[in-house]
Amino acid sequence: MQAKLLFTRLNFRRPSTTLRQFPLTCFLFHSKAFYSDLVTKEPLITPKRIINKTPGLNLSISERASNRLAEIYRNSKENLRISVESGGCHGFQYNLTLEPATKPDIKNDVKDKEFSDDLDDDDSKDIIYVLPEDKGRVIIDSKSLNILNNTTLTYTNELIGSSFKIINGSLKSSCGCGSSFDIEN
């Protein structure tokens, strides 16, 4: 009896809209289309320099990701390392880890001219994106960059937490975890 009385006092109204009125794409937050819109609206930074740049391969970094990386670097002197490995529910997964900045920063940062030809043939060399004003670095090995070519590193704030994400490029599909993906051939 009290529940019925409470229900009538609150005067619940039925919503005037139904889910059928909205296209399904409104609810696919992890879809490629959603992230494409996100990236086109978000400004990208130009790295101060790219060490060991490989022609034809690129990783874009959003302004939001750069700001967060600068904050991390300022507080703990750590850089972001991106790597890709096989696994996950879609075939590949990327790992984002923070590693301490060292002096000299990275083994591949300064090359000895005498051995530069030998180092250029190394498939595991690191490509280093130096953020503007030397406020951190993004480090990715050449094999991972080959898979993540033309993608964008961004930083998202969501209700469930904040995280770095890699979006666009040849990423065909991803899962709910946000780190597993499949690539287009």
Curated annotation (Swiss-Prot):
Signal peptide stretch: none
Gene Ontology cellular-component annotations: mitochondrial intermembrane space; mitochondrial matrix; mitochondrion
Keyword Transmembrane helix: no
Ligase among keywords: no
Further remark: Present with 1560 molecules/cell in log phase SD medium.
Function: Involved in the assembly of mitochondrial and cytoplasmic iron-sulfur proteins. Probably involved in the binding of an intermediate of Fe/S cluster assembly.
Protein name in the entry: Iron-sulfur assembly protein 2
Species whose genome carries this gene: Saccharomyces cerevisiae (strain ATCC 204508 / S288c) (Baker's yeast)
Gene (UniProt): ISA2
